[in-house]
């Protein structure tokens, strides 16, 4: 995707495969331009991260984990993917360390990418959802203390995971 340095052709393929939308090269390029205009800091970060990766042959996550990069493909994709995906994984690990479900007899049953799946009785579900949101925000702030948290986390509830995902 665009966060990881996707080009015009990649965006065309992504729109088609993911959403059934056919974009011309011109439309895809306009969409890319609009995206980076809306988030000017992102293109600067991408350029700086790639330059640094080319210079030192590695990239770091927010938590300090190092990934060695070998080859042009790694420099083009992994140099951007690792800090984002690795940082997200570190935030989730920090959230897990923060999470306290004991008082509600709630149980963590699955961790999927950026989601925590928790089972509990219906009565405390609102309080459990609030605790999950609190822990996830705390996990994010542990790595990005200056980061904005508005609309960062959104808990969903339902009788099962599929229903909660809506």
Which sequence ranges carry the predicted segments?
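Conserved catalytic core of nucleotide polymerization and phosphodiester-bond processing enzymes
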Residues: 1-166
